[in-house]
Amino acid sequence: MNDAAPDRQASVDFHLQALHPWLSRQDIAEICVNRPGQLWYEDRNGWNRQESGALTLDHLHALATATARFCDRDICPERPLLAASLPGGERVQIVVPPACEPGTLSLTIRKPARRIWPLSELLRDALDLPGVPGASQARPDPLLDPWRRGAWDDFLRLAVQAGKAILVAGQTGSGKTTLMNALSGEIPPRERIVTIEDVRELRLDPATNHVHLLYGTPTEGRTAAVSATELLRAALRMAPTRILLAELRGGEAFDFLQACASGHSGGISTCHAASADMALQRLTLMCMQHPNCQMLPYSTLRALVESVIDIVVVVERRAGQGARRRVVDIWYRDGLPAP
């Protein structure tokens, strides 16, 4: 055994003392620090915010460094992502700048289950499952009424709140980010949001539980070349309710679809396209750039895209009308043709 291992573990344990009040609680499953002085924890009632003066930026960096050394890893501007296990068996995801906002550090701890649940308890509510004798009928789609009436503000508001996967399409300068910000404002405040951007443009209520992740390339003057795909994978370990990816450009589109299809519903993103059909086509072609998709036929990937993306909203900037930006098309997979 490495003689330094006990000292490394002791260093991690020492820096974890600031989190002991929450790590020691059996009813807490997740602990997240989005910025210094503040943490969020998830219990049976959902997410809760707690202020903590002990969680200074220096302390968080010291904890990150101690954790990296304990795992024989590095965390620094050149390697700003760390997925590891703590001495107590907890899983941790740490993100430091430039992969997150300057002056912050993102820390997500997932506590292991301390109890093995019997099947009888896990399946206690199985009678509510569709298809089981005695089960309730499928709920009607609340989006169909505003869809049929053409009440598009109500439709999109309900779509966000229902966790539909939404793609905003349009040309450069058409107002895609503006609409995405408006849609993001309808996300219920109880949710935890992870955003992924190359430049900070998405604006969320400072009081909500969210983390902004940033990617870039060496040519953009960033110290670390962290890709959107790497941040998507890291985001999945950060207990997100939903993931917002500012723009889809390449193979990361497949990772985004995988995230939306793996229990993280309600994803929102944008792409450059002039119509809903072109947006779905472009998204399919982006997926083909992913290493795991290069041998798959177009039809298979197109079917995946249409099974995951619920809604496409097309925005346009029309010259000659005061440079007016407006929604010109909405495609809803489960709806009737738009009136």
UniProtKB/Swiss-Prot annotation:
PANTHER family in the cross-refs: TWITCHING MOTILITY PROTEIN PILT, TYPE IV PILUS RETRACTATION ATPASE PILT
Cellular component, GO, one term: type IV secretion system complex
Family, as annotated: Belongs to the GSP E family.
Full protein name: Type IV secretion system protein PtlH homolog
GO molecular function: ATP hydrolysis activity
GO biological process: secretion by the type IV secretion system
Entries under Pfam families matching the protein: T2SSE (PF00437)
InterPro entries per UniProt: P-loop_NTPase, Sigma_54_int_dom_ATP-bd_1, T2SS/T4SS_dom, T4SS_GSP_E_ATPase, VirB11
Gene that produces this protein: ptlH
Disulfide bonds: none
